[in-house]
Amino acid sequence: MKIITPEISVIIPVYKAQSTLERAISSINNQLYDQDKIEIILSVDDNSKYDHFKLLNKNIRILNPSGKLRTGAGEARNRGIKIARGKIIGFLDADDTWSSNYLCELKPIAMRYGMAITKTEILNQNGNYLFTLDPGYNFEIKHFGLLPGSFHPLVLKKLAGPFPDGASQDVIHCINLLKKIPYRSKIPSHSKYQIW
């Protein structure tokens, strides 16, 4: 059997996530992107067992910490980055989901510019929308921290981490990544994408 090196490693920090993790993994399984080119790293940060989630996707790797637990999402992401095999790292929280075209849309941008981020949607436990941006809304960098939701970029592995922990860490992590991006010019305003 030929082992395929993944193109994308998706890191999910896992803390008390038994009730939400299946939905997050399902959103990865529903990607239009080739599943054999995606690895999922569950970076565990509690004492719970998550082995049964391997039944949802053959490319799941479970990373159990060898030391201190409850270190926070930042440190859990850092541990995941260390073992990731993909050239691109995707970050997803255990209580978040991606639309089916997420990886197909963002990967070319991340490959070209080093990083890609998109707008977010917030759903409750039943999958009903609590918050979503209008389809025509132009999501810009200046909106970080002002809009509710998570911001989880696709980023080249060489630019990923290390991440601190703390309040508003999704925003802080994105800002830290943006500082590393070599391209800081705007593309035309009529474009579908904006580069900081």
Regions found by a protein language model. Give the residues of each.
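Glycine-rich, basic loop-to-helix element that forms the pyrophosphate-binding segment
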Residues: 67-84
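Short, acidic, metal-binding catalytic loop of nucleotide-sugar glycosyltransferases
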Residues: 26-37
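Acidic helix N-cap motif at the loop->helix transition within catalytic regions
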Residues: 47-56, 97, 101
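Conserved donor NDP-sugar-binding/catalytic core segment of glycosyltransferases
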Residues: 101-130
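N-proximal low-complexity "stem/linker" segments adjacent to membrane-targeting elements
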Residues: 1-27
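Short beta-strand/loop segment that forms part of the nucleotide-sugar
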Residues: 36-47, 63-66
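Conserved nucleotide-sugar donor-binding catalytic segment
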Residues: 138-196
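Short aromatic/hydrophobic "clamp" motif used to bind/position activated sugar donors
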Residues: 89
